[in-house]
Swiss-Prot record:
The gene is ihfB. It holds the Pfam family Bac_DNA_binding. GO terms for biological process: DNA recombination; regulation of DNA-templated transcription; regulation of translation. The keyword Heme does not apply. Keywords: DNA recombination, DNA-binding, Transcription, Transcription regulation, Translation regulation. InterPro entries: Hist_DNA-bd (IPR000119), Histone-like_DNA-bd_CS (IPR020816), IHF-like_DNA-bd_dom_sf (IPR010992), IHF_beta (IPR005685). It comes from Stenotrophomonas maltophilia (strain K279a). One of its GO terms (molecular function) is DNA binding. Signal peptide: none annotated. This protein is one of the two subunits of integration host factor, a specific DNA-binding protein that functions in genetic recombination as well as in transcriptional and translational control. This is Integration host factor subunit beta. Gene3D superfamilies: IHF-like DNA-binding proteins.
Length: 101
């Protein structure tokens, strides 16, 4: 589901709200979440999961075109950990041998 699809579905489900208001709400929520993560804060949405930053240490990578070794610096990357309710909901829907992709 894309952001546009999410906005469209929410606008249909919440018919009393204008589509522009739903669009603004979703974009504001995502902007606030991005800002919190950028500030190093953890975001927890009970029943859904939590977003945090994980540190990736410096490492040696390769340029795929030339095969040349390249030193990659350490960095922080966003990480999502699903909550128990979300894990249970997803595991009950998909059979174990199904490929979600």
């Amino acid at each position: 589901m894309t952001k546009s699809e999410l906005i469209e579905i929410l606008a249909r489900r919440q018919a009393h709200l204008k589509a522009d208001d739903v669009d603004l709400a979703v974009k504001s929520l995502l902007e606030m979440m991005g800002g919190s993560l950028s500030a190093g804060d953890r975001i927890e949405i009970r029943g859904f999961g939590s977003f945090s930053l994980h540190y990736r240490p410096p490492r040696l990578g390769r340029n795929p075109k030339t095969g040349e070794s390249v030193a990659l610096p350490g960095k922080h990357v966003p990480h999502f950990k699903p909550g128990k309710e979300l894990r249970e909901r997803v595991s009950s829907v998909l059979p174990l041998d199904a490929d979600p992709a």
